[in-house]
Amino acid sequence: MTLKELQIGKSAIVDAVGGAGALRQHFLDMGLIPGAEVTLVKLAPMGDPMELRIHGYELTLRLDDAAQITVTPTEKTPAVHAPVAEKMVEHPGLGEGGKYHTKEGEHPLPEDKTLTFALAGNQNCGKTTLFNQLTGSNQHVGNFPGVTVDRKSGAIKGHPETEVTDLPGIYSMSPYSSEEIVTRQFIIGEKPTGIINIVDATNIERNLYLTMQLMELDIPMVLALNMMDEMRGNGGTVRINKMEAMLGIPVIPISAAKNDGVDELVDHAVHVAKYQERPGRMDFCSEDDHGGAVHRCIHGILHLIEDHAKAAGIPVRFAATKLVEGDPRIEEALKLDPNEKEMIEHIIVQMEQERGLDRAAAIADMRFSFIQELVAQTVVKPHESKEQLRSNRIDQFLTGKYTAIPAFIAIMGLVFFLTFNVIGLFFQNLMEMGIDALTGVVDTALTNWNVNAAVHSLVIDGIFTGVGSVLSFLPIIVVLFFFLSMLEDTGYMARVAFVMDKLLRRIGLSGRSIVPMLIGFGCTVPGVMASRTLPSDRDRKMTILLTPFMSCSAKLPIYSLFAVAFFPKYAGLVMVLLYFTGILVGVLAALLLKSTVFKGEAVPFVMELPNYRLPGLKNVAQLLWEKARDFLQRAFTVIFGATIIIWFLQNFDLRLSLTVDPQTSILARIAGDIAPLFAPLGFADWRISTALISGFMAKESVVSSLLVLFGSTAALTAALTPAQAAPLLVFCLLYTPCIAAVASVKRELGGKWAAIMVVNQCAVAWLCALLVRLVAVAVF
């Protein structure tokens, strides 16, 4: 039978994994190997995908992919909770013996050499928390060479001679996703002096799969065993010294969230890097396992490729196992001649016949077999964790068949309600009061000092009116990002992807696409960047092109201004309708793209469902500060510049003389040439055209431009009717995103796709606004 036919609550043993290429390798890397026991936990509310439990963690899989995996039903193996016969052996300090501790006669690296570290680990293992604990505020953000994946680096606190780079969260070193490719290229290409591998102690079997591949790179390495507080709290423990002896690298128990053990981790990391103490073990295949087939295969290939690996700068053990797996990138990098390729292929075929497994499955089985032996000897299994039980109870509601969709709508509705009507609104009002008070003080001072009228106008009408009106929306943006980051860090966003996968597949997307698009409600730029986690190029492009339809928070000032001014009784309803309009148009655009440019099926949905956890306040605060800082930088650079330029163009004519009549200004002349394009939409006013142009620089500047040009909200309401305001709102909702978002799309997809997106968004906005105009004329 196939995994697709397994009943809910039943278990089975995997017999064979079908499929081919990178996807099949990804299945194997995630633990779906012959001989593994899987249990079907449940199906998504819409019947697809399924949730499995394997190697102690939850994995999602579509039914179509499950149909390619053959299984044999079995009774679920009861969990064995060995009694904790001894306390966990405390980890020895430096100099107390062991391969990786201080030895006489060593030759450390020069004192002036910067110790560079790669921080690597699975997703949801606490890597970001540890990075923040290690670096504090000593962080800077860049990009990995040649790609658009963010690169966060920083010096370890108290160690200015170090630099640690936070690598993307990955499950293996196979080239399945852009994150895995980036990690591999960084470690092999930049050759850090050390690796800090963080492992989730509560999910140790899956996490150690990456550890074994990192050890094959022959780079000094320490293992940070994170969440040990949870492990102990559930009655489990780890025999640290025994694990160190079996792995040949330092193992340090830590709790990144509580900052426990981090100082010791830093001491060991600096030590192994300074003295270049490499892993004491890289060979994980036993000579006795199935006649030593895998052992002979790997060692035979090692001798054949040693010179090629050295010339290519690739660790030979890593290159050998990747060749056995069938990694095309490694094979290409080694530049083997035809005779060598034929000999290697012969060795691999011989191994497959002796082992009874194909090449990729044999390597995956070798790794998991060693992990099982390691865990059996070093880990005292805890009782079912409190975190797992809590997650199961929460999931009964949040991913339940009849409750998942209503819960999602309610949660997102609550987020927007609290953001726009309660918390965000409260702080926004405080900010506005402060800005108004400061404006009054400055205005009075300038008047008393008899400052030149032009300068007075620039400061009050230009800077304070423009930038001040935008700054007042900072609280709303920060509050919205707070809620979205909380939902993501707790693990709920992964559940949303699980619940929504079947629905999104109907419009040509994967359930994973929901996360970038939801982030797009906060800001299009991080939404576009979040698409990097999607393994399929097709899904990435579609998601990026659709994300701008999700109304970003920078447009809130526009909605708020027009909704309150023109539809005061229905302001809240108008704003909700705008958001749903953006979603509806995005769905229609997706269906069009699916049937034209991006034909084909969405990428398979293979994803881990982590336990629910409350994110650390320090991590959330760090994220919010980064978002607020980014907004403030834009407010005082792009928006500040746009405000001054618009003020200048509005107040001077072509002779550069101060103008009394705004219609004779430079701005009026430029905008007047564009205004006829908007005549069918009902707002052929040069001032509105100007504001829309400024919105391309930053959406926040639309409001500031309108207030500068019209002089006040009252003047704006006098100039427009509700039948004109409605299509204008829809146009603002859908037309091209700001230049920062366009630049993000250009970085991700190239200039061609960015230009196509700008043109398409403007065309769609114009057509939808025209439709709304026709309806509005009939209604109002």
Model-derived features: positions:
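Conserved G1/Walker A P-loop phosphate-binding module
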Residues: 90-172, 190
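Extended, low-charge hydrophobic alpha-helical regions
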Residues: 354, 361-365, 381, 425-463, ...
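Juxtamembrane inter-helical linkers in multi-pass membrane proteins
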Residues: 433, 437-441, 494-524, 599-623, ...
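Transmembrane helix-loop junctions at the membrane interface of multipass transporters and ion channels
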Residues: 553-576, 740-750, 769-780
